[in-house]
Amino acid sequence: MKPEKPKNLGFKQIYFNLDKILFLFFLTFMMIEFVWLPSNSWIAGLLLRQTGYLFLSYNNIFAIITGSPFISLALFVLVIVNLLVAYFQIGLLFIGARHLLCHEKRTLLEYSRKVFRQSFLFMKQVTLAKITFIFFYVMMLFPVIRKILKIYYLNKIVIPDFIVDYVEDKYWLVGIVVTILALLLFYISVRFMFALSQLLFEKKTVKEAVRYSLEKTRKHSWFYTWNLLWIVVKTYLFFILLLIPILASQALMDGLTHKESLVLGIINFVLIKNFHYIALTYFLIKFVSFLTGEELEITPRRKKDHWMRWGVMGCACIFFALEGYVYLEAPVANKPLIISHRGVSNKNGVQNTVQSLEKTAQLSPDFVETDVQETKDGQFVMMHDANIKNLTGVNANPQDLTLKELTKLDISENGYHSKVSSFDDYLNKANELHQKLLIEIKTSRKDSPDMMKRFMEKYGTVLKQNGHQMQSLDYHVIDQVLAYDSQIPVYFILPYNSIFPRTKATGYTMEYSTLDENFVNKLWNTDQKLYVWTINSSESFDKSVHLGADGMITDDLEMIQEQVTIAQEDPEYTDLLFKQAMEFFNF
């Protein structure tokens, strides 16, 4: 049998159903954002407190599991519940789209009742096989779904950018492998896509659904591949075509007065958000229509249906306008501290060396972030890596060599050569240059038991007098710094955003790509600060600014300094609107 092409879907068809789909999106958003997320966070925090720990990180998770097995089991159950919430969200949106394709005249209330009733029935029929397949499809095979539809908990499952950057820098073949794998997964997603509709709408088992999809796409793989790809491309083209006149009008208005430019900016922000949801609607209905072979029709409407549609859209526009005012009017409420990562900027030298510090200090960063480790003889050396082979060619840990042996070693990076620097020399040079440091204490199992006690006794007074700050991945370091002098700022580094920590640290140094508004909102209820790393692009800068980061650790000081100046002194609303619109393309 000849396969069917996707049904046509016009703007008028979307418009006459916009109240329903907008209401569905907003209801889902409100339930997740204002009901489940706060509840989940409170429960997770309560359970974590029962373990006696103040935070959850890679270096204490094993201790939590072994020390509090029942609480750990409860936390695991909470993870499962979160996955079920994501599963329900997927089902709700797809079932909502399917009900729009039903050729029945329904009010908004009738539509909502039927969608939720069927969604709860869908949850009652959940099996491990179904949830595994649907998550695998949405997360791995066709991740466009989870990104476009903003499935919160699935979007939280990400590889932090610092790991991605490291792998790309060290292993260039990975990029080729990932590209090949992505193409392979897309092909598999085409072969399996009709299994999705069978599981969501037809109550089939995974085995039956997969068999059905493989049979349906057999001998027609290229046809379905092209049409699935075309649905995605048309969704983005649809959004871009609506976006162009908005940005063009804003660019013209930006040359006039601030007030006129801001007013149009807010209006355009509202339009962008509405067009964003219209594009989401287009993708969702088009995709479900392609899976089911059903077509969205324009059914006769009562006059009050128009009022209902405009009422829903009006409420959405008010919400978007408030969001737009905050976004456009105060892009940088407080200037963030700009911090050089490992004492270099734009590869201007070898990391953590006195020579690079002298160069970097000329760029006037607020702080220079450095890495310090203990040596075999109980001294302190400037070194980031646990094994120094990559920088020095010597296969050893800093704790295996004395300070004298380490400082004799040549160190090479970015085409520059130097000697390994001692912390004493580095600190003295920083004080001489009046350059403040953010000193990261890196710990290892080879450290002496009294390492931090000796470090603070030797350097604590000097650090405080010169305004230096400290940070560490090891919370024992935080405790000992605060015990020595609570007025020395010390930040706790968290490489992944999970359960909100309740520590005594001055603040947190977070990997930016996993950071979200929920973490920041909780932080605002404390007097703690937020540093983010590593900010090397305009995208990461924008995210950090709008989350209200107090400090940004970067490998490119001049770029971030320029971004801060523009954001504070001459924010172009056209640029801000463009960046907001680009979130639709953020993968």
Where are the regions that the model predicts?
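Metal-dependent phosphodiesterase/phospholipase catalytic core, i.e.
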Residues: 384-487, 580-586
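Conserved, mostly hydrophobic/aromatic
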Residues: 341, 360, 371, 406, ...
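C-terminal active-site rim and adjoining tail of enzyme catalytic domains
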Residues: 492-587
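Active-site-proximal loop/turn and secondary-structure-junction residues that shape catalytic pockets
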Residues: 344, 374, 387, 443-445, ...
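Hydrophobic alpha-helical membrane segments
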Residues: 1-338
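Loop/turn elements at helix/coil->beta-strand transitions in domains of secreted/extracellular proteins
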Residues: 222-223, 364, 432-436, 465-467, ...
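Hydrophobic faces of well-ordered beta-strands that scaffold small-molecule active sites
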Residues: 338-341, 368-370, 437-441, 468-471, ...
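Membrane-interface segments at or immediately adjacent to transmembrane helices
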Residues: 327-382, 389-391, 395-400, 405, ...
